[in-house]
Amino acid sequence: MLLALVPTASNAEVVIKLATVAPKDSIWHTHLKKIDQRLQMASHGEVRLRIYAGTLGDEDDILRRVRVGQLDAAAISTAGLSSIDKATQAMHIPLAFVSNEEMEYVRDGVAKQLEPLLAAKGFRVLTWAEVGWVHFFSKEPVATPDDLRKQKLFVWSNGDSANSEKLWQDFGFNTISLSSIDIMPALQTGMITAFQAPPLMALANQWFPFAPYMTDLKWAPLVGATIITEKAWQKIPVRLRQELAQIVAEEAPNLQKDVRDLEQQAMDAMVKRGLKIVTVDQAAKDAWLDAVKTGYPQIRGKIVPEKYFAETLRLRDEYRALNLQATR
């Protein structure tokens, strides 16, 4: 990563260039600004962030800039992280989780195993973060897998997207692979008629007016991480590294709480502006579960390395067993 070193009267100022696809003034951008404010205060202006929010393309574009040294850090989702290591997709297994608490337990356990993989490739994880629960948004109501098969579904073109897109297609879905920055024009022109995203993203990017039906099904949690290259980390004065790590660690729970609190508010705001929630009854839910379980053998190994797929489900089952015992 490239660090801008600007001489001052006493010390050199370290500017960490960090990018995210999150739009300016979104909840994620707001929290990054809080981290920057606290970091500048704690370091007396010696270290600061220069944040690029929603201006440098999609997550693959951001990572390319990181790799060539134009950027030092990134706040990206597992969709982008998967281009560094496929194992990060373990936290995005469809219909594997039913609650925030369950997902958090699994995330914390899996993260400990993912961080060394990213470190081996030159990236230090400052924190993991929630983006929200992914739902389907569509131009026509979608309650069942067959309903979704009638739509032109956006799938991510970054990370390990080829295998993911093929899996969707193998199960009869009509997919269009695009960069996230192309979702809006694709919706406007009818190139796509459905997309997957957390409600906060659908609202922040103003995608939902063009796909005004949201399926009431928590498809998967979308998790992200703030990463910095080891090269950039080493250029931060040693006495300030722990300060940065502590500030990020202290802000992480605040972001998590805000994301969870605002998710329902985002849905309410969209409903007031025309969004319709499509109910998924038990028969439809069973159809989704059957479709997903049929796909698990192909997800395991091709999209998520077998070891991490198994570990994710093991931790989930462990949480459920512990929670069941606690309620007896």
Model region roles, listed by residue range:
Residues 12-102, 113, 118-328:
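N-terminal secretory/targeting leader peptides
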